[in-house]
Amino acid sequence: MNKKQLGAFLKVVYKGKDRPALTNILIDSIKGKTCLVGTNGVMLAAVFIDGLDEWVGHQIARIDLEASHKAMTSRVSDTFGANEVAEIMDNGRNVTTKFPDYMSLITPYLEGEPVGQAMMRFNADFFKVIQDLNGEDSLTVNLYGEAKPMVFKSERGIYIVMPMTLKKPGQAS
């Protein structure tokens, strides 16, 4: 990940103190690809990074990832990958909180087919964060129903944005 992508990933990771499990990043494997998983309860990102096998199941504290982000320059050659994760695992904080069971959320969308729907309400800022994180000019969104998450799949990762509830005509806000 370049500096912009790492900054976007940090926007997906929860920042407050009231939900400590969400302030960490899980190193995991999805369909045989190692990844960093972060969520803030509204968005979830699983960014594929090769070479993390020995740390699967471990977590990185947000503050350690922030320090790596601050240390990066905007040069093309300055990227965050397996070597930087190794550095954090060797020198970073020991995280012992339990990461949420995100797989129960994303499993239905790893193979399922999207469905057509008439309308969905969303916050475009969340899409911009995912677009920056994925590093491409456009996004393809898979929709699975009005009250289901919006799912973005690419070679770089799997990203989920939870829908906002639609207000029905005449419904009080």
Residue ranges and their predicted role:
Residues 1-173:
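DNA polymerase processivity clamps
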